[in-house]
């Protein structure tokens, strides 16, 4: 079995394990810790975003999305980061026609990633 096949990221869709560890200068333990912290801190992000939008607080929703975009990109969660970017752009540009579907897609991917991270 190759090293790639034994890396947890090779079995977690949406997690580029190799890139994430490389960003941390090879510190796999730190990467695992950051992924666990991400799962604990952002599991309810979609709910917070929806709550802000329901309250008419588009700035808070945008800020949440912007932060989530940066965190997911820095953790090498590219598919999720792309969906967060789409949601962020929809909110930023008041694209109310598409923002719910973007947030729904982001929420599904976020839930899947967090569920898979719980297997680490």
Question: Can you say where each PLM-predicted feature lies in the sequence?
Answer:
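Two-component system phosphorelay core
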Residues: 1-120
